[in-house]
Design a protein with these regions (language model features):
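Conserved SF2 helicase motif VI
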Residues: 120-143
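Conserved helicase ATPase core of P-loop NTP-dependent helicases/translocases
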Residues: 40-42, 52-59, 65-102
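Conserved Walker A/P-loop ATP-binding site and its immediately adjacent core
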Residues: 46-49
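Conserved helicase core region in the C-terminal RecA-like lobe
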Residues: 95-101, 113-120, 146
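C-terminal helicase lobe
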Residues: 136-190
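Short glycine/proline-enriched turns and hinge-like loops at secondary-structure junctions
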Residues: 106-109
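Alpha-helical elements of the RecA-like P-loop NTPase motor core of helicases
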Residues: 24, 52, 56, 81, ...
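Conserved interdomain linker/interface between the two RecA-like ATPase lobes of SF2 helicase motors
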Residues: 1-41
Length: 190
């Protein structure tokens, strides 16, 4: 079991945490959704390093006057509370967070959630949705982009999440071929 855990951690690091292509997928989805004013947005990552890598990539590549922040378990309590409060009040356009965001957080202005965490947990998947579906007069629809990564193990997780969403009666649109034809799509480098 220890060997399997090391394998999974390395797979996750190589495929997601340290993979510039994975950052570009998140960036492309944000750019696409920003055209339709789907901000504020929350990007959920699994690990601290992934969270920081995505944040740095977005900060260095997104155009415009966007307020981008990140929060994870190592963020000091006082700073974390301020970031969460600013995001809740619409002062932060894009928040990149680890899964600590899953429980007990209320973000009524949130319009877009990008799940970049690639986890196989029905409970966490549904908890993420809970951050998104809070009602507010400023929104009539919400959007969830769930990034499905390549490789048998991670693809299986993505398929499971899609099944969880369908059980919740969500309209699931797979981008697959449509996304590959989209003008904003950048091909996979491999």
């Amino acid at each position: 079991q220890f060997h399997a855990s090391l394998f999974i951690a390395k797979l996750y690091d190589d495929t997601i945490t340290n993979n510039r292509w994975a950052y570009e997928v998140v960036l492309d989805r944000l750019r696409y959704n920003m055209q339709y004013r789907r901000l504020p947005a929350l990007v959920v990552c699994k690990y601290v390093q992934h969270c920081e890598n995505i944040y740095k990539h977005l900060k260095s590549t997104l155009e415009g006057n966007l307020n981008i922040a990140y929060v994870h378990v190592n963020t000091q309590d006082k700073a974390r509370k301020k970031i969460m409060e600013d995001f809740r009040n619409g002062k932060i356009d894009i928040l990149v967070s680890t899964t600590l965001i899953a429980r007990g957080k209320n973000f009524p202005l949130l319009k877009l959630l990008i799940n970049a965490a690639s986890m196989d947990s029905q409970e966490k998947s549904i908890q993420f949705l809970g951050r998104l579906v809070r009602t507010h007069k400023s929104k009539s629809r919400v959007y969830l982009d769930d990034i499905q990564y390549f490789g048998d193990y991670l693809t299986r997780h993505g398929n499971h999440r899609r099944m969880y969403y369908q059980r919740e009666k969500l309209k699931v649109i797979q981008l697959g071929k449509q996304w590959k034809k989209h003008p904003k799509h950048r091909p996979h480098p491999y």
